[in-house]
Amino acid sequence: MTVTAFAAAMHRPFFNGYSTMQDMNSGQGRVNQLGGVFINGRPLPNNIRLKIVEMAADGIRPCVISRQLRVSHGCVSKILNRYQETGSIRPGVIGGSKPRIATPEIENRIEEYKRSSPGMFSWEIREKLIREGVCDRSTAPSVSAISRLVRGRDAPLDNDMSSASGSPAGDGTKASSSCGSDVSGGHHNNGKPSDEDISDCESEPGIALKRKQRRCRTTFSASQLDELERAFERTQYPDIYTREELAQRTNLTEARIQVWFSNRRARLRKQHTSVSGGAPGGAAASVSHVAASSSLPSVVSSVPSMAPLAMMPGSLDPATVYQQQYDFYGSHANISVSAAAPMASSNLSPGITTTPPHHHQFYNPSANTASYIMPGENGNTTPTGNIIVSSYETQLGSVYGTETETHQTMPRNESPNESVSSAFGQLPPTPNSLSAVVSGAGVTSSSGANSGADPSQSLANASAGSEELSAALKVESVDLIAASQSQLYGGWSSMQALRPNAPLSPEDSLNSTSSTSQALDVTAHQMFHPYQHTPQYASYPAPGHAHSHHGHPHAPHPHAHPHPQYAGAHPHYPPPSSSAHFMPQNFNAAAFPSPSKVNYTTMPPQPFYPSWY
């Protein structure tokens, strides 16, 4: 027989002894996974039940019985367990049948007692069974059960005598409890035995099964385990040839090898489940903010090429990033980098590499100054550059630190759990965020312009210029906010401490007037580009020091400009037009310039979402 024919024969319906096909023709028959036919709700025929018990008595394993008879393994186990308990193969009622106390051994002993002394009463038989140790009082059959058994044993003798004398057979009800009665008195008028007689005759075959069919556990040696593990590494489901080869090498049977592979696969699945379930995704979100804030004044990595990585978290998962996006570091607003303190370099760590400032709803440069320290050529920062940047960012922090202002364009959300509506659509880390990351040559050229001046004089000039700029920015930002707040927020003036559940849609923002759009353009540019001198600031006096970004023309730049898209129009690029272009999420009603202003030839393509989103 070919393999195809064997497979077809395996899937051919196998009729498990049902006498008629009327139930099958009525559509009640089903085919199980083994190809055997069963009728749902109908017990398995007695001949199949008897065959299961006989095969089990011959020492055949239940799994082999299941495959040969095409009966499910659960059905085989249930029939065998019930036969062990009751001594009967008859199907019980739903919920299981009552265990029969009178086992075949007890029945044989009762028959001996009755044959030796026919006048013995049932209660005397019970007491004798207990006295001789055949059973104890908890397992001894009841008096009524012994009486029924004695009457059933006496019935064949009466039927034999009545049939021998020519008298008609009995009613057949009493004689149905023994196999011998079926031959003499179980026939009806048509000469065909009834189904009840056959079922009752075969329900108690009297086959002695071993009470404990469990074998001793197999103990594997080290060499056997080594062979099995090597084979398991090659394949988890060995074929017949692999099992035969392993059986020769390990001196084990194929059945033992098959069981070992099954147990090994189960153990592997359990290990995978424990590993995947033991590390929940939210466990990394419980990073302490105290540890992150304690290392805040330290400097970013000493490698200049690693400086852009300070803008994005290196080893944080999205849950931690979302947690930090809602932590605005309000308790660390007073922490600033001291100009006289030596700047100690440290490794890039999650405590320092926080999310970019334009990913925070409230950007306070004075609270996160460490991410903007300008490294020198040897990794250390020059004191002059630190003084200027620290002073300049401290002044800008007073302008852009909206937690201390009375007019808040974006109210703070106190809940760190609403990470979907706010974290979705945050700006990716673009070259705009690398506003102060420059090489050592830029700092050298900046400090070279002030080589003849004293550092204290430079600090005074920087402070004076920054104060003038901050005063002008405060006045202008207050006017812009007052002009746009009524259009954008309307009735939300009384709810400034709360944040709306969803960001404003682009349609709501597009309904504003052209002047409001102009104001939104300016406000957005102030939020996301705090270090650029925009044209509206041209009327104010410039600071008294040479800034490293704007103190020299663009052509002889010794370092890569942090804003390549503005390189063609530096330092005065055209102001944003009144028709603002909005993205699908307008990022808390912040307008962006039209993409036609962007020089795509010099700006590398940036993904909309960062890699760690």
Swiss-Prot record:
PROSITE patterns: HOMEOBOX_1, HOMEOBOX_2, PAIRED_1, PAIRED_2. Keywords: Developmental protein, DNA-binding, Homeobox, Nucleus, Pair-rule protein, Paired box, Repeat, Transcription, Transcription regulation. SMART domains: HOX, PAX. Residues 30-86 are annotated as: PAI subdomain. Its main location: nucleus. Residues 433-461 have a biased composition (Low complexity). Residues 105-153 are annotated as: RED subdomain. Residues 27-153, 213-272 bind DNA. It is found in: Nucleus. Pair-rule protein expressed in a segmentally repeating pattern to define the polarity of embryonic segments. Capable of sequence-specific DNA-binding. This is Segmentation protein paired. It comes from Drosophila melanogaster. The lineage of its organism: Eukaryota, Metazoa, Ecdysozoa, Arthropoda, Hexapoda.
